[in-house]
Amino acid sequence: MHIRTRAALAALAAIAVAGGSAAAAAAQAAPHAPRQLTFVSRLTAIQFFTASGPVTGFPTTPLVPGDRIIGQDRILQNGKPAGHDNEICTVSFGRDVLCQDIVILTGQGDLQVSWTIQWPATGTRGPATFNGIIDGGTGRFATAHGTFHAATLPDGDMQITADLNAGQQ
């Protein structure tokens, strides 16, 4: 082998090793989504829209197919503000309500979640607990999929416990 060829191969090998080391370091430095995520969701705004127009406050009559609910919540982690969410729900048949939500965790990324609930025949609020799915996300949550459980706390806030990437290896 000529000296020039050996030098070129040595340079390529050095670049490959350096590149591999840099890629490994970047992979270790990249933040990963936690396996479990817990936060509190505190209602900050809600609006009901029916066929007759917007409703002030909570509805006093049953919701019907096509009615919409738009809400926003403040997200708290360990009692401190951590972001917010924007949700929209549509009433379907049989009082089934289909909801889509984007949870925005400041400096961490977003989660797209969805759920269905059964709106009560009487009363003004949805169920005290429900479950949903995590469809994906951005930032630390770019590969997130999983499920979550929501439970109403005594003060009216919702405790959300999410299991991310369950079943993935």
What are these regions (language model features)?
Residues 1-2, 113:
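Long, low-complexity, intrinsically disordered polar/charged segments
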Residues 3-8, 19-35:
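C-terminal region of N-terminal signal peptides and the immediate post-cleavage residues
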Residues 16, 24, 156-157:
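Hydrophobic alpha-helical segments
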Residues 30-169:
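Beta-strand-enriched cores of mature, soluble protein domains
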Residues 8-14:
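Sec-dependent N-terminal signal peptides
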